[in-house]
């Protein structure tokens, strides 16, 4: 028997697919129904990792399956190629970002091709291609003309290491998401996209995304943060500070708690705080200290509450006899509401923590159910639940929601404010102070101001002759590139030296894939045919970054007439990570898995260094990362076990939405499976064999094969790949139990049918093995072009039925019978069942009602 050798087989079939242009999807679509499957395109770091293998293998299963079902499948690949790592490489290694990036793309392209992915490589592009980013500049100018792009001075998150601005979403625990540096607050003139214009549409559109994970929809809804509340003004007690004669405007979502107010707080970046800081060094020092903290809402939420009393007081709008102190507080966000709040410590935890620290009053105004108004007090935790309002004059006795409405009505009647809807979402700051990004197509003229570059002068191409001998943006230091003439007046002018956030690049690439050769940014005809993406696959870490921005840009481009859809991704699947144990030596240094030998004695596992023999500490199972050296190189796995074994393992070990722990024993199991499958094909004799319906073993095998079709189909449709693989394992055991050697004609015929079905079913998972098996069977063409098998309904039908047994209307047991068993026989089996006999003890059976293949009802007394 010939042994299966993936080193020979896999390259052979990849070459055959390439030679036949098997996965080429013509720009002009055909009559087949379309199916667009896309995995989030990778950053070209230079090497793929096992997370890539899992992500792209999943997408490939879907693409191959849909192709076999008769769909015209679009399955493209590209590169999210701009960004800081290329500039870091330039500074650290003395290479140019462009060369470094394209070299990495070339290397990763070959690695991805080695995976046997059914990708249409003719549509490949990188976001750093001038052809691509020139089209991006074109639609950016459209949005600029429409007013969706604007420029203003703003307080921004500044990464002092990368020397660039970060969006709020890119600040993780107060640090830059790439550099890890502590982020600072600075004021810079920046370019923004008006994503807030689409806030309601983005929230409401989530209701249509029923094929998205609920957790992602919730994350986006919370990030946009639509809230209804009250915007109103506190008048200053006494003389108002200069420029604030109208008072201090605040926003609240809890107007029902107005009578519980104990102070008013303003953000350190609030204009009043900055005005006071300019006149008082102590206030200035406090404001500066606040700016050193984390910038995200989560960071501010978790930080120690700090404040400074300004000495100012304001008059309560509903009780003129009451004045409240004005504090500068580090937990108040300038970019939410008005940057000023009234604080009710009894019913807000942040306010309570602050009030306890600075000995400010805590007055409860919402009485929890069952509590006594005369004795209720707030302890360490604020009460944020439902209840009746008290200590609140005209609001007393109302529930929380009714009190909110009444408080808003009263403030509006007094002409001191009005009900308002506010969002946590801020406009998207897209300026980045770096070289390796899409140039913003704007020219600055002293006479004309910012002027868009004429479209016939696009793309604005990055200069190659730049130096990376110091941090910051080399475009600012370029001797010629930035100097140009104004398109409007012809006078001297300068190019914008900021480049676009890389999330702009990935906010529309899926639309460009529909026709990457189009002269316009997006071919309307191609986009109308292919969009939306039917199945998008990627990590949940992009829920409020890439996915939200892509939804926004798609809607903006629809309003420009470039696309017809509002939502870019009809279906979204977020896969889990690939994890591995992490190892350390005695010096606390991380050790690569390839250098570790594991020994198992009973339930105890120990590790030593393969070369030195020194003991190794086995650490936690964590996401594979270069920093912890717990990375397994895909190319090493491909060399040792074959590509198909690696593909199979990452889909078989756990549900795809969960993390999968990489183990050598696991991939070895997948390797053994591929060889066992091949052995079954190899052992099958050639020839035509007649089916024999009287041969029980043959019929059982045929039934198993046709049921397998349904199981695997359902597993792919439901993204339960591991379940489908498990069924394939089970069926292989069934095949082995009916060996070809010495088999009857009926069993050989059943085996031949089952093997043909098996070759088609494993094709999405192990495509190289499937092709070799298909060829071994002598089938015409390639299995990739074969249709998905259809189950024979009669053979796939379950022979057994589980019938519940009810005695006097209560379920007391169940029996298994063959489908179609006569009623008299079912009654006999039911009355002989031990559980039924136990419940009938002492009773007389008066009537038995059998609903064929459904249920047995026994009446007894």
UniProtKB/Swiss-Prot annotation:
Domain of life from the UniProt record: Bacteria
GO cellular component: cytosol
SUPFAM superfamilies, alphabetized: Anticodon-binding domain of a subclass of class I aminoacyl-tRNA synthetases (SSF47323), Nucleotidylyl transferase (SSF52374), ValRS/IleRS/LeuRS editing domain (SSF50677)
Motif ('KMSKS' region): 623-627
Span of the annotated motif 'HIGH' region: 42-52
Compartments reported by the entry: Cytoplasm
Binding site for ATP: 626
Record-linked PROSITE patterns: AA_TRNA_LIGASE_I (PS00178)
Annotated EC: 6.1.1.4
Pfam families, A to Z: Anticodon_1, tRNA-synt_1, tRNA-synt_1_2, tRNA-synt_1g
Coiled coil: none
Keywords recorded for this protein, A-Z: Aminoacyl-tRNA synthetase, ATP-binding, Cytoplasm, Ligase, Nucleotide-binding, Protein biosynthesis
One Gene Ontology term of the molecular function aspect: aminoacyl-tRNA deacylase activity
Membrane-spanning parts: none
HAMAP family for this protein: Leu_tRNA_synth_B (MF_00049_B)
Name assigned to this protein: Leucine--tRNA ligase
Origin species: Caulobacter sp. (strain K31)
Gene name of this polypeptide: leuS
């Amino acid at each position: 028997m010939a042994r299966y050798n993936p080193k020979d087989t896999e390259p052979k079939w990849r070459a055959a697919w390439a030679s036949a242009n098997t996965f080429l999807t013509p720009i002009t679509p055909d009559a087949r129904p379309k199916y667009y499957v896309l995995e989030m395109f990778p950053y070209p770091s230079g090497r793929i990792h096992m997370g890539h293998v899992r992500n792209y293998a999943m997408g490939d299963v879907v693409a191959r399956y849909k192709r076999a079902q008769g769909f015209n499948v679009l399955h493209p690949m590209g590169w999210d190629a701009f960004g800081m790592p290329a500039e870091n490489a330039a500074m650290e290694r003395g290479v140019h970002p462009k060369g470094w990036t394209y070299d990495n793309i070339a290397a990763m392209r070959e690695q991805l091709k080695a995976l046997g992915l059914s990708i249409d490589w003719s549509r490949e592009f990188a976001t750093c291609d001038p052809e691509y980013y020139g089209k991006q500049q074109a639609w950016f100018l459209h949005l600029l003309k429409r007013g969706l792009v604007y420029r203003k001075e703003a307080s921004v998150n500044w990464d002092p290491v990368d020397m660039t601005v970060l969006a709020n979403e890119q600040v993780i625990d107060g640090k830059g998401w790439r550099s890890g540096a502590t982020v600072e607050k600075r004021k810079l003139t920046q370019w923004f996209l008006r994503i807030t214009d689409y806030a309601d549409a983005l929230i409401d559109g989530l209701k249509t995304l029923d094929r998205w994970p609920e957790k992602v929809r919730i994350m986006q809804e919370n990030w946009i943060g639509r809230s209804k509340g009250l915007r109103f003004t506190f008048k200053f007690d006494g003389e108002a500070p200069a420029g604030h004669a109208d008072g201090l405007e605040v926003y609240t979502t809890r107007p029902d708690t107005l009578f519980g107010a104990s102070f008013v707080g303003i953000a350190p970046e609030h204009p009043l705080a900055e005005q006071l800081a300019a006149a008082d060094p102590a206030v200035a020092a406090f404001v500066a200290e606040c700016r050193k903290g984390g910038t995200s809402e989560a960071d501010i939420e978790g930080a120690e509450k700090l404040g400074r009393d300004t000495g100012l007081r304001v008059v309560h709008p509903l009780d003129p006899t009451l004045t409240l102190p004005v504090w500068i507080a580090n937990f108040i966000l300038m970019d939410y509401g008005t940057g000023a709040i009234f604080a009710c410590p009894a019913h807000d935890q942040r306010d309570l923590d602050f009030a306890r620290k600075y000995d400010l009053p805590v007055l409860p105004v919402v009485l929890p159910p069952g509590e006594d108004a005369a004795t209720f007090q707030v302890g360490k935790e604020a009460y944020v639940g439902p209840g009746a309002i008290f200590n609140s004059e005209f609001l007393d006795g109302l529930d929380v929601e009714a009190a909110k409405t009444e408080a808003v009505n009263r403030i509006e009647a007094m002409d001191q404010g009005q009900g308002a809807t506010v969002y946590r979402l801020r406009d998207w700051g897209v300026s980045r102070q770096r070289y390796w990004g899409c140039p913003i197509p704007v020219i600055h003229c002293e006479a004309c101001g910012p002027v868009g570059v004429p479209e016939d002068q696009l793309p604005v191409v990055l200069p190659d002759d730049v130096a990376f001998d110091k941090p910051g943006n080399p475009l600012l230091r370029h001797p010629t590139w930035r100097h140009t003439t104004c398109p409007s007046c012809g006078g001297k002018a300068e190019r914008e030296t900021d480049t676009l956030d890389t999330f702009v690049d990935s906010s529309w690439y899926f639309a460009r894939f529909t026709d990457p050769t189009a002269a316009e940014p997006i071919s309307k005809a191609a986009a109308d045919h292919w969009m939306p993406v039917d199945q998008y696959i990627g990590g949940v870490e992009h829920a409020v970054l890439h996915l939200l921005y892509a939804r926004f840009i798609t809607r903006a481009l629809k309003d420009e007439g470039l696309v017809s859809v509002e939502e870019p991704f009809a279906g979204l699947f977020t896969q889990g990570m690939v994890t591995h144990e992490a190892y350390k030596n005695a010096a606390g240094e991380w050790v690569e898995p390839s250098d570790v030998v594991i020994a198992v004695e009973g339930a105890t596992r120990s590790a030593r260094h393969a070369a030195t023999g020194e003991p190794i500490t086995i650490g936690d199972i964590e996401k594979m990362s270069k920093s912890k050296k717990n990375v397994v190189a895909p190319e090493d796995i491909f060399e040792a076990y074959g590509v198909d074994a690696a593909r199979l393992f990452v889909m078989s070990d756990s549900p795809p939405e969960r993390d999968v722990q990489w183990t050598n024993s696991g991939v070895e199991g997948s390797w053994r499976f591929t060889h066992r499958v091949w052995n079954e094909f190899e052992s099958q004799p050639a020839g035509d064999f007649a089916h024999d319906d009287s041969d029980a073993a043959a019929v059982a095998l045929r039934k198993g094969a046709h049921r397998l079709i349904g199981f695997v189909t359902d597993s792919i449709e439901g993204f339960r790949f591991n379940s489908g693989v498990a069924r394939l394992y089970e069926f292989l055991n069934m095949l082995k139990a009916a060996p070809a050697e010495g088999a009857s004609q009926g069993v050989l015929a059943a085996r031949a049918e089952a093997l043909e079905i098996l070759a088609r079913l494993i094709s999405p998972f192990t495509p190289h093995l499937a092709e070799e098996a298909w060829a071994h069977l002598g089938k015409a063409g390639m299995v990739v072009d074969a249709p998905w098998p259809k189950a024979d309904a009669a053979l796939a039908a379950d022979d057994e039925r589980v019938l519940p047994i009810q005695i006097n209307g209560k379920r007391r047991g169940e029996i298994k019978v063959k489908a179609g068993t006569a009623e008299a026989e079912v009654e006999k089996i039911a009355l002989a069942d031990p559980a039924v006999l136990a419940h009938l003890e002492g009773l007389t059976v008066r009537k038995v009602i059998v609903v064929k293949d459904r249920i047995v009802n026994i009446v007894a007394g």
